[in-house]
């Protein structure tokens, strides 16, 4: 019965191991689980056999006691003294048979106990090996997942930095576009003013003469304004070209932002032809790319 009490903690530990091994997914872990289940069933079968042998010994002891009582009753009934020696001999034979039976049962119980002990040690060794393999596999999986996480984190950081740089560049381009729009408005005003002065000069050629010094100053100011305009145009064109190249080289980075990305749409540039009557009256373009030509006075 002491062996049976030692088996119960083993069953409890086996149930705990079973509960832990439920989460195993690979085939190797399923095989280990099946092996543990088979060992558990063998241990239970051996425990039942051990209990059955104990019960058999108890029943034999009871039967022996009953037979001894019957013998005593028969001796009391058959009280002749002539059979006293025969009764003693019979009693001695029964005692010897009972001792032989006890010896055989003891040997059987010892063999069963040894078998149970060996099975328990084997099961413990297999369970330890299975747990070690499972722990090693968990460590390897955790290491692999951490490495993948680091790679993903580095890639996300790189994409975020690239998007930040693109956003800064877009903001700078928007500022340049706004400056360009202001410059265009200013240039349009200058062209309108030049047109009006041209009409006034054509209407009154004899009554009004422009001083030579004032004309030179006015031309210098106009040349400076046109130079500033064309420098702003070149800066804006370079910014637009660089933005186009950057967006064409990295289409995936911008799509990663999804609906969170900033969609920067520049306002439409005012057309140079918006003042149609001014352009139709002039026979030459307002100014060349060099910024040195002037419209006819």
UniProtKB/Swiss-Prot annotation:
Residues 147-297 form a coiled coil. Residues 256-297 are annotated as: Disordered. Keywords: Coiled coil, Differentiation, Spermatogenesis. InterPro entries: CCDC159/163 (IPR039284). GO terms for biological process: gene expression; single fertilization; sperm flagellum assembly; spermatid development. It comes from the Eukaryota. GO terms for cellular component: sperm head-tail coupling apparatus. Interacts with DYNLT2. Interacts with GGNBP1. Interacts with OSBP2. Functions during spermatid development; may participate in the centrosome reduction procedure of spermatids and is required for the formation of the connecting piece/sperm head-tail coupling apparatus (HTCA) and the correct and tight attachment of the flagellum to the nuclear envelope. This is Coiled-coil domain-containing protein 159. It comes from Homo sapiens (Human).
């Amino acid at each position: 019965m002491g062996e049976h009490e030692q088996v119960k903690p083993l069953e409890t530990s086996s149930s705990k191991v079973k509960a832990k091994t439920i989460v195993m997914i690979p085939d190797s872990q399923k095989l280990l689980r099946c092996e543990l289940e088979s060992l558990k069933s063998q241990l239970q079968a051996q425990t039942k056999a051990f209990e059955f042998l104990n019960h058999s010994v108890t029943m034999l002891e009871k039967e022996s006691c009953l037979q001894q009582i019957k013998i005593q009753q028969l001796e009391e009934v058959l009280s002749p003294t002539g059979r006293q020696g025969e009764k003693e001999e019979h009693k001695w034979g029964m005692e010897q048979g009972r001792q032989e039976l006890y010896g055989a049962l003891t040997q059987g119980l010892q063999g069963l106990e040894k078998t149970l002990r060996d099975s328990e040690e084997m099961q413990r060794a297999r369970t330890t090996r299975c747990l070690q393999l499972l722990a090693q596999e968990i460590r390897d999986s955790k290491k692999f997942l951490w490495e993948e996480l680091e790679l993903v984190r580095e890639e996300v950081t790189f994409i975020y930095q690239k998007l930040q740089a693109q956003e800064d560049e877009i903001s700078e381009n928007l500022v340049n576009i706004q400056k360009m729009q202001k410059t265009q408005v200013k240039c349009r005003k200058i062209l309108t003013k030049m047109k009006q002065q041209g009409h006034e000069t054509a209407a009154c050629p004899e009554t009004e003469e422009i001083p030579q010094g004032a004309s030179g100053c006015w031309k210098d100011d106009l040349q400076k304004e046109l130079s500033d305009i064309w420098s702003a145009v070149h800066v804006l064109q370079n910014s637009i070209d660089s933005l186009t190249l950057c967006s064409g080289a990295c289409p995936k980075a911008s799509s990663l932002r999804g609906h969170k990305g900033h969609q920067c749409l520049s306002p439409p540039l005012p057309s140079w032809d918006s003042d149609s009557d001014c352009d139709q009256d002039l026979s030459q373009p307002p100014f060349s790319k060099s910024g040195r030509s002037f419209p006819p006075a």
